[in-house]
């Protein structure tokens, strides 16, 4: 996720104390902030920001970047009392998970510079429990040159149209999909997109749907449209090369960059990695199929990756100042669109020079459905657990019914533990 897609803080005035309200600086020199982030594909951008912040303020950002083991590292540090000054998480359900540990940003002046829609996923009962890092989209990315060279001019919107395009590509010797199935987070992102509109049409909205799942009054096995999920995963696997279950993020980005594969399910965060391999790659964005309902096909669009400040940090004011810098300084406002090349939560920020970001905005402006990342409302821990179950399905270990049974059991167990 990288998931998944996900801002950063600093002093707004260089000569001032790191602490507000008359508090004294705890050390003779500038503070050192500890940060625990994920998205290792952004390591160079993190490093650039760290260097810029150090140069402007003298404050050191001691940043650790993890990915697959991120949650276990964060949980271990929280349980041991070694909470980072600043850490990342998802939005939505993670607001509840970390509410006892994080600082409420609602009274900070710089928060008013953020887009109200970006704040929805971090707001609970009027409290703003995190800082939306990136505004991201995920769906199917395609190589425009490969499509054009093989005469695919009508972009697919339905499962049948994806199948027809894949057949044509495979007949030409092109691998239609690079699956990414080895990454636990790719499968949930792919799967839940296939039922996103169903949640609203049949279950009264995302919050209501998740509430019923949490209470056990609804199960995945009750949702008839889960066939959309299995049909889509089967299609990707069928046209996903000789070893679809061994494909990871690096495989996806490499194959689409070099034109050896035509389509990947990923987010706009993948573009920078693709361009490191092929700077001139011509990329486009496709809607994700919802069975064969062309009108329901859309993209997933939200701000999920979240920065949180530990409320009991000894460097609390320094951490708040860093976020203020991220939001208001020239470098901070340009960091996401200019360096990360993604959409910023800052309302007045410039648009990034990114094909996928530009296509995202264009599609939404033309009325293409943009669905929120509602699966991030599921209890913390479900993404990896349910992703592993879907990996088992794609590997042929379980059939559809056994997979639904496993999804129901895993969700119920995690939801009960979260109560």
Predicted regions and their residues:
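Extracytoplasmic/periplasmic substrate-recognition and gating elements
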Residues: 51-52, 56, 60, 80, ...
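Conserved N-terminal structural module of periplasmic/extracytoplasmic solute-binding proteins
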Residues: 3-9, 13-94, 101, 110, ...
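C-terminal capping/gating helix-and-loop segments adjacent to ligand/active sites or protein-protein/ligand interfaces
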Residues: 62, 300-301, 338-345, 359-413
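Glycine-centered hinge/linker elements that transmit conformational signals in sensory
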Residues: 167-168, 210-245
């Amino acid at each position: 996720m990288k998931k998944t897609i996900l801002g950063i803080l600093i002093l707004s005035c260089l000569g001032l104390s790191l602490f507000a309200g008359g508090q004294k600086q705890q050390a003779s020199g500038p503070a050192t902030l500890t940060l625990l982030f994920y998205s290792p594909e952004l390591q160079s951008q993190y490093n650039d920001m760290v260097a810029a912040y150090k140069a402007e303020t003298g404050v050191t950002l001691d940043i650790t970047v993890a990915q697959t083991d991120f949650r276990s590292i964060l949980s271990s540090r929280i349980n041991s009392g070694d909470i980072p000054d600043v850490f990342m998480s998802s939005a939505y359900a993670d607001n509840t998970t970390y509410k006892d540990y994080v600082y409420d940003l609602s009274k900070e002046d710089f928060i008013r510079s953020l887009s109200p829609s970006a704040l929805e996923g971090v707001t609970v009962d009027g409290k703003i429990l995190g800082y939306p890092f990136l505004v991201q989209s995920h769906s199917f990315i395609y190589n425009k040159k490969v499509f054009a060279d093989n005469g695919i001019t009508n972009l697919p919107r339905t499962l049948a149209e994806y199948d027809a395009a894949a057949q044509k590509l495979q007949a030409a010797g092109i691998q239609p999909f690079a699956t990414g199935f080895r990454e636990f987070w790719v499968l949930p992102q792919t799967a839940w997109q296939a039922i996103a509109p169903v949640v609203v049409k049949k279950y009264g909205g995302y919050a209501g749907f998740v509430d019923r799942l949490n209470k056990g009054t609804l199960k995945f096995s009750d949702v008839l449209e889960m066939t959309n999920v299995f049909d889509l995963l089967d299609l990707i696997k069928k046209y996903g090369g000789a070893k679809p279950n061994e494909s990871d993020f690096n495989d996806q980005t490499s194959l689409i960059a070099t034109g050896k594969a035509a389509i990947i399910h990923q987010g706009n965060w993948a573009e920078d990695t693709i361009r490191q391999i092929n700077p001139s790659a011509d990329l486009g964005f496709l809607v994700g199929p919802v069975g064969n309902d062309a009108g329901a096909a859309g993209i997933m669009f939200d701000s999920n990756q979240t920065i949180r400040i530990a409320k009991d940090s000894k460097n609390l004011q320094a951490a708040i100042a860093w976020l203020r810098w991220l939001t208001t300084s020239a470098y901070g406002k340009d960091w996401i669109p200019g360096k990360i090349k993604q959409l910023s939560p800052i309302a007045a920020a410039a648009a990034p020079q990114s094909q996928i970001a530009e296509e995202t905005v264009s599609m939404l402006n033309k009325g293409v459905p943009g669905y929120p990342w509602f699966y991030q409302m599921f209890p913390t821990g479900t993404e990896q657990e349910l992703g592993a179950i879907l990996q088992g399905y794609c590997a042929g270990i379980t059939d559809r019914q056994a997979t639904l049974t496993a999804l129901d059991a895993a969700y119920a167990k995690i939801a009960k533990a979260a109560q």
